[in-house]
A protein has these predicted regions:
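Basic, Lys/Arg-enriched alpha-helical interface segments
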Residues: 1-92, 100-115
């Protein structure tokens, strides 16, 4: 099991997604609707992606692969990886991460719609 380290950008994005999902849950409870919103679904998918990433960064569902357009935050020669939060969706979300800074640590660099 890996320990996660978050960049300020990733922390802010995660908090914003969580707040939108909670607002949707509250609104749904007030209006007595049963169907979950897109914001709730997206947050659930992000949490699932993070869970898989912590337990196994090579989990087949993540479809993890190297991403060359972002610099590694700790090591210029290090690799940055992209994991799928969503698939086959317009503007599908991706999670960018790298190994480090310490042993058994992963850094979540960003959570963004597909670039």
């Amino acid at each position: 099991m890996f320990e996660l380290v978050w960049t300020p950008t990733a922390t802010a994005t995660f908090a914003a997604l969580q707040a939108k999902a909670q607002a949707s849950i509250d609104h749904r409870a007030r209006s007595k609707r049963a169907k979950a919103s897109k914001d709730e679904g997206l947050f659930k998918q992000v949490v699932k992606c993070i869970t898989h990433l912590r337990s196994n960064p090579r989990h087949p569902g993540l479809q993890t692969h190297e991403f060359h357009s972002l610099p590694h935050p700790y090591d210029k020669a290090g690799k940055v990886f992209e994991a799928y939060v969503q698939n086959r969706t317009p503007g599908a979300y991706r999670l960018f991460w790298c190994y480090g800074p310490g042993k058994n640590q992963l850094t979540v660099i960003a959570i963004t719609p597909h670039p």
